[in-house]
Amino acid sequence: MTEYRSASIIIPVDDDYKEFVMAYVSQELKSKLAPKIKAICKKHGVKASLAVRNHSTLVLNVKSGKIDFIGDYGDSPETRADAEKFGIQVNPYHYKNHFNGDAYFFLSEVIPAMNAGNWDKSDIQVDYFNVGWYIDVNIGKWNKPYALEA
């Protein structure tokens, strides 16, 4: 497995300088991960685009498809109504608790594919986050909802 080097920054800490690795995703990395992600989308009948935001986040924007993300999301009618109106920003750490059915199976494949070669050496107790890059999965957008295809 290939591990990708992120950008680093040198910061003065306690009269000394320490190097910190920052989350970084390049267009080159996106193009290496894209074929696998696109294949998963095609397998599940989902139309999506892949983007890089702020050089730190790999973003998958799901626009339309055969998966009923709204129906497979949340337990309450209020949650589903908000999702229909504003879209869904998937939590990549807790999607297993929020989705079921086909949406769960799609996310269970695409999120690990987006994280291929990534690392997470974060220490939450000291509020220090060290990841190769972040990922976001958006189902629809606030101004253009997800389109369920028959």
Regions found by a protein language model. Give the residues of each.
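Structural alpha-beta junctions
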Residues: K42-K47, W119
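Charged, low-complexity intrinsically disordered tails and linkers
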Residues: M1-D15
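Extended hydrophobic/Leu-rich segments
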Residues: A7-I9, V21, A83, M114
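Short beta-strand
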Residues: S49-R53
